[in-house]
Amino acid sequence: MAKDTTGRMHVQVKTGGKRKLSSKLWLERQLNDPYVAQAKRDGYRSRATYKLIEIDDKYHMLKPGMTVVDLGAAPGGWSQIAARRVGAEAGKGKVVAIDLLEMGEIPGVTFAQLDFHAQDAPEKLRTMIGGRADVVMSDMAANTTGHRKTDQLRIVGLVELAAHFAGEVLKPGGSFLAKTFQSGADAELLAQLKRDYATVRHVKPAASRQDSSERYVLAMGFRGGEQADLL
């Protein structure tokens, strides 16, 4: 164990046995990540919780009584915060969450293990929502291939799918938040969001690793919803 340039103790993991270098580096990063440690102390399910906390503290998306949809919810960090801030724990708001993976129960959160790409997923989600939503948020990430251009297109495609769903279920004035990555492949997506929402911005919370191109697109003030049919 050694100190880094900030004076914090830095845990180093030895490579041995069947452990690959990539696994060693991932484990070492997790052990030395202050947000991972803080999440454990605070009782949150993931470090991603702090990303939503920072974004919502600044832009005030989540308010008591709201209905929120959390796409790609597992392990549940965002759903925890959303349920608390909209009052779902007390039955005043609603949080609907889906993910390909299982997710442990969270008070005030209705969860379904669903593939968002599945043809019947939007209809099932609408049934769970039972009306229109105030916020649709997505922390989904596409599987990577290692080919940069292909990965960028996959990521943008996933955000486009989430944005399309948001356009179908959001109330006028609603908000859409989605994880994306810095690239030149999202110009068309951003143009569409700017037509559909009053304000569109990119945000990079402090909890996003600085060596990552990860960022979030936040669109607020949804302009549609009045004429769209909700099945």
UniProtKB/Swiss-Prot annotation:
S-adenosyl-L-methionine binds at G76, W78, D99, D115, D139. GO terms for cellular component: cytoplasm. It comes from the Bacteria. Coiled coil: none annotated. Disulfide bonds: none annotated. Its EC number is 2.1.1.166. GO terms for molecular function: rRNA (uridine-2'-O-)-methyltransferase activity. Pfam families: FtsJ. It is an enzyme of class 2 (transferase). The keyword Transferase applies. Its main location: cytoplasm. It catalyses: uridine(2552) in 23S rRNA + S-adenosyl-L-methionine = 2'-O-methyluridine(2552) in 23S rRNA + S-adenosyl-L-homocysteine + H(+). The active site is at K179 (proton acceptor). It is found in: Cytoplasm. Keywords: Cytoplasm, Methyltransferase, rRNA processing, S-adenosyl-L-methionine, Transferase. SUPFAM superfamilies: S-adenosyl-L-methionine-dependent methyltransferases. Specifically methylates the uridine in position 2552 of 23S rRNA at the 2'-O position of the ribose in the fully assembled 50S ribosomal subunit. Belongs to the class I-like SAM-binding methyltransferase superfamily. RNA methyltransferase RlmE family. PANTHER family: RIBOSOMAL RNA METHYLTRANSFERASE (PTHR10920), RRNA METHYLTRANSFERASE 2, MITOCHONDRIAL (PTHR10920:SF18). This is Ribosomal RNA large subunit methyltransferase E. It comes from Bradyrhizobium sp. (strain ORS 278). The gene is rlmE.
